[in-house]
Amino acid sequence: SKNCKSLLLSHVTPPAMISGIRASSYVAVRTGYKYIQFIDLPEEFATCVDEYLLSLKPLPSPFLINGELSEKAKRGRKVFEKFKCDECHSGPYYTDMQLHRIGEDVEFEKGWDTPTLREVWRTAPYLFDGRAATMKEVFEVYKHGIDKKISSKEADELAEYVNSL
């Protein structure tokens, strides 16, 4: 099974869909209606869906304190840098918009799209197959993107930072 990519920011963080099967969300909207819903959608309707998706804006994270990172999240930002999370989760949307192979999965040989970390606090479960119930599990249990030893404290701080984005 696979986890779905959030539609938030989907029109500015191509490719579309977690498998990157569509070059953009503009393409995904049209092909989704045609090949999944089997509806020949007039272009003006597809444009309305595009405009709606473009209108979605991230909400401030409830992990922020008065709009700022907590001390724990600030330490987590340093952990983010230490483990080079920004090699894949970079830029204003915290994504390089590339496909990456994760583990031994062969279902999608090209890899999985790097999702934005914006509003990740509201999109559990995590990882491409939804196996991580919490952000801390992503790092502490599944060691996502981490090739070094991570302490429980570092995993907790990193989760706090990522959930603050």
What are these regions (language model features)?
Residues S1-L165:
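Periplasmic c-type cytochrome electron-transfer domains
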